[in-house]
């Protein structure tokens, strides 16, 4: 029983870290990267689909994203989706190819992004701690019902705390790396 709880906690904590990583990929850092726009929803024959399903996205010269739609008819819809996004990007269309030059980040924008990063990191830490709290409550409940001994309860709580510390450290490392990338001129 305790092993199942610990495995469940580990799985849920890993998911929290993965969600934080996914959030980090969506933040613009001045470098061109396909993950910045691949999640944008494009109106494709009446249904909303991710950009990556209607076009290929490549990086050109490190600072330009190149979008090659698979159908010429979807060029306008892709442009519209990019304009509607809050990324502050300006697409330039040449025939069927859309180029998006990445403007350099201002110091003010870097600080804003850094604040957003810290906020997202705190949300991820809270999510990990919530998993820990749920598991600790389950362990205490098992102790009350005499399903586990007090020694097993303490051991399990210590292991869950170690898991929590490890995943929070992972979040901190991801945050530090992304902040360094954002603040780099």
What are these regions (language model features)?
Residues 98-185:
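Positively charged, low-complexity, intrinsically disordered RNA-binding extensions
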Residues 22, 80-88, 119-123, 133:
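Short, intrinsically disordered, mixed-charge
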Residues 1-76:
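A positional/architectural concept
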Residues 2-5, 24-27, 36, 40, ...:
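Generic detector of leucine side chains in alpha-helical contexts
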Residues 27-44, 49-60, 92-104, 135-142, ...:
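Glycine/charge-rich, flexible interdomain linkers and switch-proximal surface loops
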Residues 63-92, 96:
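Glycine-rich active-site/cofactor-binding loop and its immediate structural neighborhood
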